[in-house]
């Protein structure tokens, strides 16, 4: 009977970059899980490209969700796969591509993001945490999804690396020409990447506006 979120209502327009902020436990991650279909709301609807997702048959829902680009807070790379295999993992299951084609695709993606090609044959355990987050972003844009979702992309990173990740996110969104939702608690990150900000507090949307309006509100 515990209510996690209530009266949540917002739109993400084509080309927009939205940041969702709030304290730990405010429901940000629950909202992300609902958007990507891991959790269902008890009431209401979720539409992606004007398609109602909540009661959509699983096979049709998967066709839509496969075209979302998602990064999770801890990267969620597969330890047993090389970096190039991680990057193309989503489409490798959907399309028949051989090793040469796969490596060429992974190389083209990391070049767009300005990452070095020497990491492609390494395993996740052989690169830093910051680089793992970069690889997760590269994987998210594989297949050119039009909606990207980032869960705490700068969490656990020093300010310099966090700033670099934000620049990479902007490059990724620009590369696919799509829209983005970023779940974060990092106010500096919000100002760097977002066009619009939603503050979740006490289980609902407490405020919605631009980063500039947010800074004015808190007198920074």
Named regions from a protein language model:
Residues 184-185:
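H-loop/switch region of ABC-family ATPase nucleotide-binding domains
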Residues 148-151:
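Catalytic Walker B motif of ABC-type/P-loop ATPase nucleotide-binding domains
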Residues 144:
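Conserved catalytic motifs of ABC-family nucleotide-binding domains
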Residues 123-127, 131:
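Conserved ABC ATPase signature
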Residues 100-118:
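Conserved ABC ATPase "signature" region
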Residues 36:
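Helix-to-loop junction immediately C-terminal to a conserved catalytic motif
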